[in-house]
Amino acid sequence: DKNNGGSHLFGLFKEVADIKTADQLHLPTPEAHYETMVVQPTEQQEEMVAALSERAADVHSGNVDPSVDNMLKITSDGRKLGLDQRLINPLLPDDPESKVNACVRNVHRIWQDGQEDRLTQLIFCDISTPKAGSAATPLERLGEQEGEKGNSFNVYDDIRGKLINMGVPPEEIAFIHDADTEVKKKELFAKVRSGQVRVLIGSTAKMGAGTNV
């Protein structure tokens, strides 16, 4: 039994290991300051949200074949729509007040303010990740479901391009997805710590626990 074997192995590990939690070690951690930014939906987003509700009603009533539409597809489309309407249709306008553009302006402001000390920023984005597919984690692939196939728009590239247009040097912006080996990750994290890379964009799966910057 694999589960019993795993439990036995963990039991043996605890016999020789001295396990301490973060609370027991009293490790110094910076105090986080949270700021919630609220943006208003576009007219197109409001219309598409209504369409999502209609699709959900059809699914729940059994009026649509699950192979055609289902709650997983609807939820995936809702996540994309909540981030940027161009993830649903790349031909829709780039709303100046969108979440992505609000993020870009904020990141650029902090980048300017931190010039002297070479301060760095991490941007987390779990959908519309670069190189979706073989390099993507299962969590990321949930954001790359039906409807995004063939969609040329990508949030990571959009943020990077806009920051470059606003004056951020290209070499100061990096994607965690480009560091596809432990050696490359180590080199990238060193550049972030030194301020050579000042904006690092990644997903929770690839840039969450274990990231040392």
Language-model region placement:
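Short, high-confidence coil segments that cap the C-terminus of an alpha-helix
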Residues: 116-118, 196-197
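Conserved helicase ATPase core of P-loop NTP-dependent helicases/translocases
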Residues: 160, 164, 169-204
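Phosphate/oxyanion-binding active-site loops and adjacent basic polyanion-contact surfaces
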Residues: 9, 92-104, 151-156
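Conserved helicase motor "Helicase C" RecA-like lobe of SF1/SF2 P-loop NTPases
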Residues: 128-175
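A short beta-strand element within the Helicase C-terminal
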Residues: 211-213
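Alpha-helix capping/helix-boundary segments
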Residues: 129, 205-207
